[in-house]
């Protein structure tokens, strides 16, 4: 089983800009990664592979900023799942998060 990622370890490997929500590499983790490169790839959310595990960037942002893993869901205030700026993230219950789902257009 993989060792749980800590804030200390996260900060050794990645830099997080709370204003832009962008993570960049502080160390080379593979031949394809250069120091200063933007970390992660875009899907439904931004994902970052770190220490053999795949993480959602918004959850890493929470750990980076507050030192603990979120105990609830993380909601993006503006509904943009790629905007991981700290001001755009809030910890919510599942039911609170459902209120932020847009109305279907069909």
Model-inferred region functions:
Residues 13, 18, 49-106:
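Short, cationic Gly/His-enriched loop motifs
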Residues 1-50, 54, 103-104:
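Short helix-coil boundary/hinge micro-motifs
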